[in-house]
Amino acid sequence: MDFKENSIYINVMDKIYAREKEVLSQNQDFQENNLSRISLILNYEDFSLKFDESLHGYSFGYVTNPFGLKLHSPFTETVRFDGAEKYIYMKRILGVPSNETQLCNYQHQNFEEKDSQKELLPSPQQLTPPTSLPSLPLLPLPQAPEQNEEQQLTQPPSPPSIPPPPPQKKQIQIFITPSGIVSQKIQNFFRDTQIKSTDPVNCSLDHSIKKNYSLEEIYENNKNYMDKNNNFLHFLFTFIDKITIKDLDHFEKEINRVHNIKKLINQQNMKGETPLHSLIINNSESCLKKLVIAKINHMGIFDYSKCDNLNKNLLAHAIEKGDIDVIRLVLIGGCPLKMSPRSKLFKKNFKIYRQQIYRVFEIKEFLTKIGFNQYIPMFLEFEFKNININYLIESFKFKLNINEDEILLWKLLTEPYKNLDFKSFCSEYQIKHQNDLISETMANHFINVCQLNPHFGYIDFHTQIGSAGNASVFEGTYKGIPIACKEMPVSGTYEQSVDSIKEIAAVGQIKKLGCATVVETIGVLKYNQKLFLVMVKEKCNLLSFLCNKSEILKMQREGIWTSIFKISKDILKGLVSLREAGMYHRDFKTANFLVSNTGKILISDFGTSRDENEKRLNTFAKTIGTMWYRCPRLGDCSEDEKTLTHYNEKSEIYSLGIILWELVCVAMTGTYISPKIPLFQNEVDFLIWIHKDYRFSFPVGTPQSFVKLITRMCLPFRDRRPTVRQVLDNVKAIKKEFLSNRGIEGEQTYSGLECWREFNFSKQNVTRISISNLHNTEYKVVNKYDYASYNNKNSLLMKRYLDNSNFVVELINPNGLFRFKSFFEKEKLLYLKLKSTYKDEYYFDMSQFLTTIIQIHQITVIYYKMLQKYRELRLLRNNNNINKNKNNNNNNNNNNNNNNNINNNNTFNNSTNNNSNDNINIPYDFNNNNNNNNNSCNNSKKFKSISESTSALGLEASSSSSSSS
């Protein structure tokens, strides 16, 4: 070896050792976890340096053992060599092709040409490769302190044809410590110790089998190479490679010759890993993994119940690797399942096959019970091809020779999640059968639900899609049908267990009548000490449907009022069906109605439902239902009015009135408006406020028929509310009214004509406008582009946007300076909407609002009158005295103008009072402000002047409208 080649060789070795020391010095955990299994006492020639091509054009060095197997250590994958170094080293020093496969084949050819007689290890002076023949690369040998390492490496090679015999039959071995430094004490210890060892060539497994060496002899010769925790099979299965082991029949023969093979295959190291654990965990070839596991299964010598220190068995590691064939073989061997369907392991890897994995255990149990263990692989093949086992029963009936009783037993075993009966459930959860808790009728309804599906197959549910009260709802599939599994809180308190029975019994009571307006129930599933109510999964709930803008646009294209009428009729028909079944739902809201794929509205969530004949009347407390949909007088009466504390049919009419109000607001505004009142954060404040006979406001233009119906449904005293049948008849009558007035042109006397035209703002002859009941609202000039501050709930903002090819103006409440010049557009109809907001959300129930259609010059009048009122109320910030004087002069002029406008508008107000609502579109008279304020929600004197300015503004707008028309 010339000086240039020797320098490259030394450079490569220096890189390897330097990188190894750097990695080990920085990461102590890496040293303990990865080097503990390969800290071996190795012969000098037992390692060779090889190269691998990387994806980025670099070459990585790695070290091989006597079998030609790759040893993974910190420096094997981090040392990079440039192209010149690799080419010179592979071509000139090794003298063999750079391809790894060709290199190994070349080595095996040399192995067969050598003598089969075992050779002793030569001296260190003989280890340098000859220049003429190809040889394996060598690691630098650490020398004794009196000998320089660099001089050792630069010694000229000795010709291989005349090998001088060693002075003593001693083997020179090195010990690679975790820090990568050779221990001098161990080296001196083995210098005078003669250990039996085979030649590196003869240590190859293929060569050993060919020379009739047994694995037991190989293990005895190589046990010093392994650490004390791993046996030979750990070592073999960890570094198994496709090149060295090609015929596992020889492998099986040699395993049979080992007397303690069963002990070795089940031996665990410090990490609790068996040799099969090492086989699956390490990056060995998948085909070899399958062959080795198949041979071990055939021999039946491995205990699959063994787990490592992390409590993971072979199945858990196989799932982490994601190899379906390895999982199948592990299951055939009898590996138990120690994970739930919703475990992190299943969520991370292998979601598709978890259902089959669970079914495999039931199939194995059944086949073992009837004595057909040999058919387990056949059925597993079908299971892992996504074929349901139920379809195979008839096909294999004759082959397995089983009768009908055994087939029934098969179904019970392969479908383990069977329905439970009432008695077993009550006895398990210690529920007493008392008349005041669970009646016989309720028990019968419970049993009927359990018998809806006699035998459940495996239900795959893993994703939580929502919650209903204290219960979680999961999404899953059953026989190809999307389902929703509601977890029943049976493992909690005694009351929760009883409530679960009552909910299931309520479903059975409704199911008995065949109500088509209730979500379809499949049955009851008991799984993992939990109870699940299995239902068909629908599209979404009604709340999500109304909040979805795309769905609203779709309804507008098809006719939004037609959709609203259909939804209202489905909801009312559902309530009628509950009344026929003698049930009270007690929690009606949009979130508890489901929208099916066909657009039908179905009732769901019977967690608070009760039978009308239930004797425990104290269950009808004021806490039932959702706060914003709850009857206001419920549970808030004196003891003399005990009958009002009971829940009845009229109590649910109030909740339906709120739902109809939500639907009407969607039809009128095109957006969903929540009935939630954010000012009241607790239940007590809500009850105090709701007892003031508060009525929700309606957008202007709402049909009077709907206004009157919803107002009657939401009356504080329930005796005055209509029945369900009356509400259904009224909705049908309103629909006829809609169909008869929708096509009439030019009719201006009908209130809400534009509403019936479904946002078709094409009319040019708008006769009047009115601004009413803007109480508790300060007028403030705001900026169109400033949306940062939403803290002041009483300020206003005018914003323009385009809706159905019509310009729309909104008054909302961010602070700032408003620019009005962009609104001067002629012959365009604008939609003016006054809103009061709170925390970036719109609520119509904060005050009275206005919705009307006006022309563009009317907006300018309103705008300039606003500015005049600002100056009157001194809301504009003026720092100079001159500006204050100007404002005072302007205020005097404005007061005179306002008085004139009021006097001129008295006749207009008298003519329009007959056609207006009690709460909507009532023009204000400046002289009658006190009377109007008494009818409002707030009688505070704080906003008296503001209310007067609001009324005056309404009169001015009305006068401008009448003059312009």
Swiss-Prot record:
Entry-linked SUPFAM superfamilies: Ankyrin repeat (SSF48403), Protein kinase-like (PK-like) (SSF56112)
Glycosites: 760, 765, 905, 909-910, 914, 934, 938
Species for this entry: Dictyostelium discoideum
Binding-site residues, ATP: 465-473, 486
Region (Disordered): 114-170, 881-942
Transmembrane region(s): 653-673
Protein name (record): Probable serine/threonine-protein kinase DDB_G0291516
Residue stretches of biased makeup (Pro residues): 156-168
Keywords: ANK repeat, ATP-binding, Glycoprotein, Kinase, Membrane, Nucleotide-binding, Repeat, Serine/threonine-protein kinase, Transferase, Transmembrane, Transmembrane helix
Recorded GO CC terms: cytoplasm; membrane
Ranges: ANK repeats: 271-301, 310-339
Presence of keyword Membrane: yes
Keyword Transport: no
Its EC number(s): 2.7.11.1
